[in-house]
């Protein structure tokens, strides 16, 4: 049955208008975004197929093209639409980190870093450069490595901090292996980085390790204290 023949209270778009987006299930929100399904399959049924296949929104939005396009009703246009969603969310979070309130919300920082790093198959090292009010001046990818190793040069991080006239820095990298526990090389690198930044009066606020949906904070675990 076509969605147009459903009771108004069960149609995702009408339900959203009446009750707000929070009242919709993941599949219903996806259906609103996809707009149409396929022959003999409504947008809601297509959305449910996607959720059954991938199990979560995170897995869906980070899935490769071949896996998504293997679902009947998912063409390249719809796949492209899906790719835009996490990027829009990442940019929205980046804007929130630039507001006068700065980094008052650790959850926003975690979400931003998770959206930026979790989908990547290689280890990538990023830096958030902050002003004296903890507002983000810039976010830069500085190093990219193999699946299990990234060469990080503290002097380059310090150089970029000076270029941005940053008062403090947050660094982060991902573990594509799925384990967010810092390695000994992570701890050693953080010690070197903290010392290099200290020489130019720039504070290292935190180092995050991102692995899938998990984010490890050096600051929260007291590991920054041992790094200086």
Curated annotation (Swiss-Prot):
GO terms for molecular function: metal ion binding; metallopeptidase activity. The keyword Zinc applies. The keyword Hydrolase applies. Pfam families: RadC, UPF0758_N. Residues 102-224 form the MPN domain. Keywords: Hydrolase, Metal-binding, Metalloprotease, Protease, Zinc. InterPro entries: MPN, RadC_JAB, RuvA_2-like, UPF0758, UPF0758_CS, UPF0758_N. It comes from the Bacteria. One of its GO terms (biological process) is proteolysis. A motif (JAMM motif) lies at residues 173-186. Zn(2+) binds at residues 173, 175, 186. Belongs to the UPF0758 family. This is UPF0758 protein Reut_A2732. It comes from Cupriavidus pinatubonensis (strain JMP 134 / LMG 1197) (Cupriavidus necator (strain JMP 134)).
């Amino acid at each position: 049955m076509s969605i147009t023949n459903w009771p108004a209270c069960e149609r995702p778009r009408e339900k959203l208008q009446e009750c707000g987006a929070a009242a919709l299930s993941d599949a219903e929100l996806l259906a609103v975004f996809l707009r149409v399904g396929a022959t003999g399959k409504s947008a809601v049924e297509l959305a449910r197929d996607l959720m059954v296949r991938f199990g979560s929104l995170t897995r869906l939005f980070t899935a490769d093209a071949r896996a998504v396009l293997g679902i009947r009703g998912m063409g390249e246009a719809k796949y492209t639409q899906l790719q835009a969603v996490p990027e829009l969310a990442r940019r929205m979070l980046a804007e929130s980190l630039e507001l006068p309130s700065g980094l008052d919300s650790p959850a926003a920082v975690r979400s931003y870093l998770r959206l930026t790093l979790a989908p990547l198959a290689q280890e990538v090292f990023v830096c958030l450069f902050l002003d004296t009010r903890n507002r983000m001046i810039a976010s830069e990818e500085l190093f990219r490595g193999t699946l299990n190793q990234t060469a990080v040069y503290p002097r380059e991080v310090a150089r970029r901090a000076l270029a941005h006239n940053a008062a403090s820095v947050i660094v982060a990298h991902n573990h594509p292996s799925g384990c967010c526990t810092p390695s000994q090389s992570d701890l050693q690198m953080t010690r070197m980085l903290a010392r290099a930044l200290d020489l130019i009066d720039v504070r290292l606020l935190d180092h995050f390790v991102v692995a899938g949906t998990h984010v490890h904070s050096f600051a929260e675990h007291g590991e920054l204290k041992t790094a200086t």
